[in-house]
Amino acid sequence: EHDSHGELIYLIREYFNFTKDTTFLRSKNKNVIKAVEYIESLIAERSTDHFRNGNDSVRAYYGLVTESISHEGYSAKPMHSYWDNFFTMKGLKDAAEIQKILGEEESYQKIKKVRDTFKENLYNSLKLAMKVRDIDYIPGSVELGDFDATSTTIALTPCNEFNNLPKPEVYNTFDKYFEFFTNRRDDKIEWINYTPYENRLIGSYI
């Protein structure tokens, strides 16, 4: 599950946000650096000429982290999940900020470059995935173009990528979910399953 690497960095930064404990932050920076290095190794597997120079459906994978079962939603077959990639984006952003806080200029410049390149590739991937699947919402994964607002929601909170997400597709995503929610609430459709993961959407609507 490749969300974990970015989540580790995010957790370390979040602890610092509350405590302002720079001694703690410095003691964990080696873990931050190792997590970034591992993220780089995953990105490298999808940064080859095959993915760089392929058709749109192949280039949609370029520069992402590799496939995983992600948030357990792809346990039947690992996918290139945007859940993983948005947590990767969050981790790289926080890792860069941690270096600034600690005055580690060399590490900051290195991670900043990784972050900025990943950001460009992530949003290129989203555009290509939506184009290939002919969809007007943010997909859950590259392969499926699946609608999964309970996954996409983390792009807004805690990953804070709203300003960068393509419009109107991000609005369409949450409008589509809200319609599904109200139709269930009002007994307009037959349904069985409800997942508590849907609670994640509350932060995005707020």
Task: Annotate the PLM regions.
Residues 14-17, 41, 45, 101, ...:
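Conserved helix-loop functional segments at active or binding sites
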Residues 1, 21, 25, 77-81, ...:
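Alpha-helix N-cap/helix-initiation motif
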Residues 29-33, 37, 79-86, 90-97, ...:
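Active-site core of glycosidic bond-cleaving carbohydrate-active enzymes
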Residues 1-7, 40-117:
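The feature captures the catalytic groove of carbohydrate-active enzymes
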Residues 5, 11-42:
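Hydrophobic or amphipathic alpha-helical targeting/insertion segments
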